[in-house]
């Protein structure tokens, strides 16, 4: 008896200590990354303190000493609020504001008389070290999966540091200070542009970096400190271009779900910014040196700019009008499974966005031409406004581009559930023993309910959900799948996406085990798909909840003439039954549907110790997939419906310019990069554009 108790006690203690070691390993890794961030912050604080001390020592300016002591006092208050009163938000807000302010002072105070001082050189090296540590910390956080991306335009940290930096610029003359404040606004717009993954965000970043160190922009006296401020703010949104798995509507949620008045005011605000840029561009007319070039050029391209931006503002206004209609439906049926993106698709928003993308491109082109014609290298305010307008129009272009690519795709789904997960020695599925039938029926019913919920939530037309305890014959499955693959919409064309779900017994090679000893190979299914799809550009997504889905996931990556994806499950075979139940068919379906139908889920596919893992693969051309684009007649009808008659001549120009395909080189390079990413750096979460995502552990 004592031996049994001693054995049970020692066994439980061993399990507890093993689990504690695993938790400690995970916590230690997370803590190490967090401490790396603290180290970067402390290193930056030391650099700021040393830099301000050098400036006070060399200039004997008592104001620097007062501000320096006040800054340390404020940081001390922030620490007290954090550790003794648990006021984390107030503490972090106060410290971030002062970090931005003190770093701004370090930038703007003149250091020309002591550039070669040892302490000043040490400050520069500390700032460079802070840049390296900040980039390393952000990269490790994202690689380790410790960052949970949330939809936001600007984080509180970014906003407060930008405000603090702008306040520090008031130590300069009014004109120089205004130039820097506008530059800070441009940096905020660039951060939002990157976080939204706009199509032209990277070119905007390059342009901003090139123009940043123009003398006319009143670049601070300490370019290293300015580079530290710039890079530390840009690092997170730049890395999130790859690491963020948020869909288009999730990224734009702070804007799309904003109230009607706020969105209308944003259009008015955008119009004021555009008008200010045009007025500043007109200052070029004072240049009498090249009057024979400036006056005709500004007259011609200024008129072109005005017409394009009238269209630009009307396009934004029309977009918000249609979005308001979508909001009415959304808030009326919030209890249903109708999300805003699906409502926008049903309201024809995709067609509107595809045409608007072309129109906003004209605005970008007109802004670039007008900026080149009225270039003022000695006017810092003009250049700052130019850097504000570019990301603003880039975001509008990116919004229409991405919504046009992800909205409006029709889809149809078919589910097959064969609850026969026991095999005879020759590999044929056999019926389960009677004592397991009830349990299996409950599990299979749960799978059917889950997949039907998935179809209903994402507004996927349901062809059928077949459930067969005795299995399906090859001929029966052949007729059903062929009928499914040749389905068309009510209007006549094929659906954009076909979703096939299968849960049942498979062989080790991934083949579906059918009744009568038959099997269904992936090659056979692809041949049926080619036969029915023909020259159309529809997609096929196969979702497998089976024990041997990995072979199909690997095999689909070799297909190069179709748009096909396979989402599979991987069941861990060796599981400690005292810690977790062994995985069963249906567990993956339950988690995957919950992940795609509940935005507040807590499912982490990369979590250690998962008994059911996800794996997916896509064909080589998957990233090239695009929906139907509007024709020239579609653009003409849209123009006549939304814009004044005076702008009609631009219809022919729009059709002609879009027909030139000016970005064919960029699109080709972008397509190659996307193919490279999908083949070598397959993302953990892949947005299908239909509202749901493919995932891998």
UniProtKB/Swiss-Prot annotation:
<feature type="glycosylation site" description="N-linked (GlcNAc...) asparagine">
    <location>
        <position position="111"/>
    </location>
</feature>
<feature type="glycosylation site" description="N-linked (GlcNAc...) asparagine">
    <location>
        <position position="598"/>
    </location>
</feature>
<keyword id="KW-0325">Glycoprotein</keyword>
<feature type="transmembrane region" description="Helical">
    <location>
        <begin position="380"/>
        <end position="400"/>
    </location>
</feature>
<feature type="transmembrane region" description="Helical">
    <location>
        <begin position="265"/>
        <end position="285"/>
    </location>
</feature>
<dbReference type="InterPro" id="IPR029713">
    <property type="entry name" value="TMEM168"/>
</dbReference>
<feature type="transmembrane region" description="Helical">
    <location>
        <begin position="293"/>
        <end position="313"/>
    </location>
</feature>
<keyword id="KW-0539">Nucleus</keyword>
<comment type="function">
    <text>Plays a key role in maintaining the cardiac electrical stability by modulating cell surface expression of SCN5A. May play a role in the modulation of anxiety behavior by regulating GABAergic neuronal system in the nucleus accumbens.</text>
</comment>
<feature type="transmembrane region" description="Helical">
    <location>
        <begin position="63"/>
        <end position="83"/>
    </location>
</feature>
<dbReference type="GO" id="GO:0017080">
    <property type="term" value="F:sodium channel regulator activity"/>
</dbReference>
<dbReference type="GO" id="GO:2000058">
    <property type="term" value="P:regulation of ubiquitin-dependent protein catabolic process"/>
</dbReference>
<dbReference type="GO" id="GO:0031965">
    <property type="term" value="C:nuclear membrane"/>
</dbReference>
<feature type="transmembrane region" description="Helical">
    <location>
        <begin position="646"/>
        <end position="666"/>
    </location>
</feature>
<protein>
    <recommendedName>
        <fullName>Transmembrane protein 168</fullName>
    </recommendedName>
</protein>
<feature type="glycosylation site" description="N-linked (GlcNAc...) asparagine">
    <location>
        <position position="533"/>
    </location>
</feature>
<feature type="transmembrane region" description="Helical">
    <location>
        <begin position="223"/>
        <end position="243"/>
    </location>
</feature>
<feature type="transmembrane region" description="Helical">
    <location>
        <begin position="199"/>
        <end position="219"/>
    </location>
</feature>
<feature type="transmembrane region" description="Helical">
    <location>
        <begin position="36"/>
        <end position="56"/>
    </location>
</feature>
<keyword id="KW-0812">Transmembrane</keyword>
<feature type="transmembrane region" description="Helical">
    <location>
        <begin position="89"/>
        <end position="109"/>
    </location>
</feature>
<dbReference type="GO" id="GO:0030133">
    <property type="term" value="C:transport vesicle"/>
</dbReference>
<feature type="transmembrane region" description="Helical">
    <location>
        <begin position="352"/>
        <end position="372"/>
    </location>
</feature>
<comment type="similarity">
    <text>Belongs to the TMEM168 family.</text>
</comment>
<feature type="transmembrane region" description="Helical">
    <location>
        <begin position="172"/>
        <end position="192"/>
    </location>
</feature>
<keyword id="KW-0472">Membrane</keyword>
<keyword id="KW-1133">Transmembrane helix</keyword>
């Amino acid at each position: 008896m004592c031996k049994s108790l001693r054995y049970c006690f020692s066994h439980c203690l061993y399990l507890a200590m093993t689990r504690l070691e695993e938790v400690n390993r995970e916590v230690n890794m997370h803590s190490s990354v967090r401490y790396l961030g603290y180290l970067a912050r402390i290193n930056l604080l030391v650099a700021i303190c040393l830099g301000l001390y050098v400036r006070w020592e060399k200039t004997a300016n008592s104001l620097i000493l007062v501000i320096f002591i006040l800054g340390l006092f404020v940081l001390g208050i922030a620490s007290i609020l954090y550790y003794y009163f648990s006021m984390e938000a107030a503490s972090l807000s106060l410290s971030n504001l002062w970090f931005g302010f003190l770093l701004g002072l370090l930038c703007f105070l003149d250091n020309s008389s002591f550039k070669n001082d040892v302490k000043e050189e040490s400050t520069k090296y500390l700032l460079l070290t802070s840049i390296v540590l900040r980039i390393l910390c952000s990269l490790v956080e994202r690689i380790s999966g410790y960052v949970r991306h949330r939809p936001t335009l600007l984080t509180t940290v970014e906003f407060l540091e930008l405000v603090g930096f702008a306040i520090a610029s008031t130590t300069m003359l009014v004109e120089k200070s205004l130039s820097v404040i506008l530059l800070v606004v441009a940096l905020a717009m660039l951060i939002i542009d990157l976080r939204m993954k706009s199509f032209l965000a990277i070119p905007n970043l390059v342009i901003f970096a090139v123009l940043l160190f123009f003398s006319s922009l009143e670049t601070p006296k300490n370019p290293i400190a300015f580079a530290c401020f710039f890079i530390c703010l840009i690092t997170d949104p730049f890395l999130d271009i790859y690491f963020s798995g948020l869909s288009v509507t999730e990224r734009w949620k702070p804007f799309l779900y904003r109230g009607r008045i706020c969105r209308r005011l944003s259009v008015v605000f955008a119009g004021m910014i555009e008008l200010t840029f045009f007025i500043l561009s007109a200052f070029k007319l004072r240049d009498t040196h090249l009057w024979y070039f400036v006056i005709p050029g500004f007259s011609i391209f200024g008129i072109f700019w005005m017409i394009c931006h009238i269209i630009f503002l009307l396009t934004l206004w029309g977009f918000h009008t249609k979005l308001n209609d979508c909001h009415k439906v959304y808030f009326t049926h919030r209890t249903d499974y109708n999300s805003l993106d699906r409502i926008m698709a049903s309201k024809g928003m995709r067609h509107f966005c595809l045409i608007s993308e072309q129109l906003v491109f004209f605005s970008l082109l007109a802004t670039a031409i007008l900026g080149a014609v009225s270039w003022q290298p000695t006017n810092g305010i003009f250049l700052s406004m130019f850097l504000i307008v570019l990301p603003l129009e880039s975001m509008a272009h990116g919004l229409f581009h991405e919504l046009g690519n992800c909205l409006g795709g029709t889809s149809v789904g078919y589910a097959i559930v064969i609850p026969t997960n026991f095999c005879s020695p020759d590999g044929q599925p056999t019926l389960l023993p009677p004592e397991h039938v009830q349990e299996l029926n409950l599990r299979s019913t749960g799978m059917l309910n889950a997949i039907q919920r998935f179809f209903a939530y994402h507004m996927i037309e349901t062809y059928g959900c077949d459930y067969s305890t005795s299995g399906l014959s090859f001929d029966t499955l052949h007729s059903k799948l062929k009928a499914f693959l040749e389905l068309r919409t009510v209007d006549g064309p094929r659906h954009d996406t076909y979703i096939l779900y299968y849960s049942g017994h498979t062989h080790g090679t991934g083949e579906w085990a059918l009744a009568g000893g038959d099997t269904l190979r992936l090659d056979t299914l692809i041949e049926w798909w080619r036969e029915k799809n023909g020259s159309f550009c529809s997609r096929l997504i196969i979702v497998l909840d089976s024990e041997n889905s990995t072979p199909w996931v690997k095999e689909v990556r070799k297909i190069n003439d179709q748009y096909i994806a396979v989402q599979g499950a991987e069941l861990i075979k060796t599981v400690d039954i005292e810690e977790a139940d062994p995985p069963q068919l249906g567990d993956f379906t339950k988690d995957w549907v919950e992940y795609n139908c509940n935005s507040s889920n807590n499912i982490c596919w990369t979590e250690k110790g998962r008994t059911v893992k996800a794996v997916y693969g896509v064909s080589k051309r998957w990233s090239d997939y695009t929906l139907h684009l509007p024709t020239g007649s579609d653009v003409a009808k849209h123009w006549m419906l939304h814009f004044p008659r005076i702008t009609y001549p631009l219809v022919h120009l729009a059709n002609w310019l879009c027909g030139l395909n000016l970005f064919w080189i960029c699109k080709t390079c972008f397509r190659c990069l996307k193919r490279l990413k999908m083949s070598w750096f397959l993302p953990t979460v892949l947005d299908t554009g239909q509202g749901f995502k493919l995932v891998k552990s």
